[in-house]
């Protein structure tokens, strides 16, 4: 049996929930949105870098902290999207609407809680985490932190709204709003940083305004009934439904733990990697930047799989859940192979776009090419497949596997391999960096193998949330 064969003979074409045209309309805007976010993000970094080293360092420190919050809001959004998708597949749009309202309640409550905790204790918090940085960097970080924290409620609303629209198969709207948000951010940076010359505060205000603008627009669309199955009803009347909140949190909490712990693991690896020298740090940063572009198809298809597989599970179409999961994985492998092959070929040119020393450039080129090989073979099963499992409600399994794999291989093995190399040859910091990445590839192999087995044994099909 071919795992990734989409066999129409197993069910009549007329009985299939989704056409290939539908899948294309769902996934292509998600790919475009991911690419846009990466490209605009790079432009944003260039604009912010004009503030100076202290400013860009402060922004970088706050962004690392903010990433934990972003992962948390994304996890709640995933929980809401899974529950909403399953109810839509079950032909229970009224339940999907109730899930939407409860998702918004949870997201707003948690985001305002973080605002209430982070703002008064911002000095203590940043000093506790980044106490060794210089005074100018800390001053920049504190200024940017205030504006970033104020944007959390808007970020929560945006993530939740976008996830709900995706659960209905409408990914075009979030793409359009994403374009609007990024234009706001770029224009805001230009006006406030270059024009008004208010420096780091300008970058923070632009972040706040762009997130607020995107959240307000998406929220307004979500409040309109139109022909949508999911919309917010009676928003002026607060409604707390504990059973529905439990369903959302049953997906959101494990996903949040998984995402947050993964981010902590990445930060730890970055911490011990910082001892390998400037060339290794720069090469690692460039490889991560280039690799993130090759992951765009897999990330986009992972988001789309929540809608497709979730609705199949809700409709009790388990065969179709397997079929579409297989098809989406096949598309992921083909698309990531194509993108990774292009990056592999043009690696010298891409790395050459960055101002690096000869040592860093050679190291970045070598690691980027090995990463592209691993990406095309290992990454889809390790990171796209778990979204298929989560869409069915199999979130505890993915959380446990991901956390064990991350600590055992990405952190422990990376540390042991790289430091063994340095112990044998102290001058071989370039080889030590290869050791870090090799540990990460082992992480991909381990989690990918277990997710593959889980998909094959079909136990994930019995984890329905609703």
Predicted regions and their residues:
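Transmembrane helical elements of multi-pass membrane transporters/channels
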Residues: 25-44, 147, 158, 181, ...
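Residue-level hotspots within the lipid-embedded alpha helices of multi-pass solute transporters
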Residues: 34-38, 71, 111, 115, ...
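Small-residue hotspots at the loop-to-helix junctions and early N-terminal turns
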Residues: 53-64, 141, 145, 204, ...
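Small-residue-rich hydrophobic transmembrane alpha-helices
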Residues: 56-116, 155-174, 281-347, 379-401
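Hydrophobic transmembrane alpha-helices of multi-pass small-molecule transporters
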Residues: 68-71, 185-189, 215-219, 293-296, ...
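Short runs within selected transmembrane alpha-helices of multi-pass transporters and secretion channels
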Residues: 77, 147-166, 174-182, 203-218, ...
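Short alpha-helical transmembrane segments in multi-pass integral membrane proteins
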Residues: 1-30, 84-151, 195-253, 309-375, ...
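Helix-terminus/linker motif at the lipid-water interface of multi-pass membrane proteins
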Residues: 35-57, 126-135, 191-200, 260-293, ...
């Amino acid at each position: 049996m071919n795992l990734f064969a989409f066999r129409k003979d197993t069910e009549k074409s007329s009985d299939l929930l989704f056409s290939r045209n539908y899948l294309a309309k769902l996934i292509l805007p998600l790919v475009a949105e991911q690419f846009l976010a990466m490209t605009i993000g790079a432009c944003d970094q260039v604009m912010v870098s004009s503030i100076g080293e202290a400013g860009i360092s402060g922004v970088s420190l706050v962004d690392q902290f903010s990433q934990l919050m972003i992962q948390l809001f994304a996890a709640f959004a995933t929980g809401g999207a899974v529950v909403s998708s399953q109810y839509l597949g079950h032909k229970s749009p009224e339940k999907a609407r109730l899930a939407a309202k409860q998702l918004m309640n949870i997201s707003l409550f948690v985001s305002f809680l973080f605002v209430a905790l982070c703002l008064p204790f911002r000095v203590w918090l940043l000093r506790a985490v980044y106490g060794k940085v210089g005074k100018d960097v800390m001053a920049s970080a504190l200024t940017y932190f205030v504006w970033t924290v104020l944007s959390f409620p808007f970020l929560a609303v945006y993530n939740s709204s976008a996830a709900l629209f995706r659960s209905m198969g409408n990914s075009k709207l979030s793409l359009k709003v994403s374009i609007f948000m990024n234009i706001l951010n770029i224009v805001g940076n230009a006006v406030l940083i270059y024009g008004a010359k208010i420096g780091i505060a300008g970058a923070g205000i632009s972040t706040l305004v762009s997130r607020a603008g995107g959240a307000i627009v998406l929220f307004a669309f979500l409040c309109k009934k139109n022909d949508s199955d999911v919309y917010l009803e009676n928003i002026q009347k607060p409604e707390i439904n504990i059973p529905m909140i439990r369903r959302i949190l049953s997906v959101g909490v494990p996903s949040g733990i998984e995402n947050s712990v993964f981010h902590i693991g990445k930060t730890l690896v970055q911490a011990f990697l910082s001892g390998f020298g400037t060339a290794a740090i720069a090469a690692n940063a460039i490889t991560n930047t280039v690799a993130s572009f090759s992951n765009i198809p897999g990330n986009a298809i992972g988001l789309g799989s929540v809608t497709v597989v979730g609705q199949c599970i809700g409709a009790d179409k388990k065969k179709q859940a397997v079929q579409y999961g297989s098809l989406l994985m096949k598309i992921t492998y083909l698309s990531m192979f194509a993108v990774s092959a292009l990056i592999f070929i043009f690696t010298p040119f891409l790395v050459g776009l960055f101002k690096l020393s000869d040592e860093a450039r050679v190291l970045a080129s070598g690691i980027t090419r090995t990463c592209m090989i691993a990406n095309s073979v290992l990454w889809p099963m390790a990171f796209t497949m778990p979204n298929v499992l989560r869409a069915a409600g199999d979130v505890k399994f993915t959380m446990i596997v991901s956390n064990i794999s991350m600590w055992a291989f990405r952190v422990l093995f990376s540390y042991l391999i790289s430091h063994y190399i340095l112990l044998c040859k102290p001058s071989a910091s370039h080889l030590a960096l290869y050791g870090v990445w090799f540990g990460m590839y082992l992480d991909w192999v381990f989690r990918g193998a277990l997710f593959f087995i889980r998909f094959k044994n079909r136990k994930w099909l019995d984890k329905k949330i609703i």
